[in-house]
Amino acid sequence: ASDVYKRQLWVLLAVSSCCTSAPLPPAEEQSERLQIIDTHIHLYDTNRSEGVDWPPVTDKVLYRPVLTEHFDEVADREGIASTVIVEASSRPEDNQWMLDLVKHNPDRYLALVGSLPIGTDEFSSLLERFSKDSRFVGIRMRDRPGGDDFFTDAVWRDLGLLAGKGLTLDVLINNFTIDEVAEVAKRLPDLKIMINHLGGLSITNDPLDIKWKESLKNASQYENVYCKVSGIFQRAGIKPTPKERSFYSPVFEIDFDAFGEDRIVYGSNWPVTDRGGSYAEQLNIIQGYFNPPVKRLKDSIKGGLIA
């Protein structure tokens, strides 16, 4: 398993131990090297002869080639040092396509959270194959075949295989619930689980859903559960997409209170961010809220409190 997604990721928001047992560099060196790592982008090529699994042709914003040269332009402009790619296809061979696509620049393209058909006879051999590449650091549960009957014995078996290899499970809450994340975390305490996109809440000007807050707090009690502050524009339940930090701050606060500095990471969800605004706009909103926690984090590093 990779030391990349599983090591301490120096990100905008915090240092995520989600992923590691690797020793840290000296404290002085850490604070000097604090960099932004975007842990959630998508890459795909709509010009491939076999087409793409996503996005659909009807998506006028996203249906275009989105490749390394396009993200490099964004990253260079916005000061993003490195990134983790998250699957955008349910086709197993697209994992290899992605790994091949980014092999020319391992310093920027650190890792892939891939897609494998969990709960099937093919899962074990595919996991064995792709996990031999240290950049393949886990999978994402996005689709939910079987509906309410998704969590079969075969699914639990495969989640156990994932945990046994020290890999990470990303979860898109659209088709799953935070309570289900908590159940997986309870049954498989060695499986590192990353909740995507703030916990999946649709953010409006209404009071935040109490049940959602309670579920998130409950899931956070399991130390193998982490949260991505990602896809903030996609979580906005009103249009046009708000650009005021105050609109997102209540959810930021709940996520931060639940998971703290050590179990939150930054992810943009680029290029899906383009549906709501620019990369810089979402980054500035997140930076504006989380900069004080980062200052506290830097101070604790200097004080030798993080080891």
Give residue spans per PLM region:
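Short, small-residue-biased leader/transition segments that mark boundaries at the very start
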Residues: 1-5
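Mid-to-C-terminal alpha-helical segments outside catalytic/metal-binding sites
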Residues: 6-10, 18-20, 25, 29-39, ...
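Mid-domain alpha/beta scaffold segments of enzyme catalytic cores
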Residues: 28-165, 284-287
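Short beta-strand segments
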Residues: 38, 84-87, 113, 228-231, ...
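Active-site beta-loop-alpha junctions enriched in small/polar residues
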Residues: 42, 88-89, 115-119, 141-144, ...
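Short catalytic/ligand-binding loop motif for oxyanion handling, primarily in non-cytosolic enzymes
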Residues: 45-46, 92-95, 148, 202-203, ...
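Alpha-helical elements of Rossmann-like donor-binding domains used by nucleotide-donor carbohydrate transfer enzymes
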Residues: 70, 97-100, 125, 129, ...
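Catalytic pocket-lining loop regions of alpha/beta-barrel enzymes
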Residues: 137, 148-265
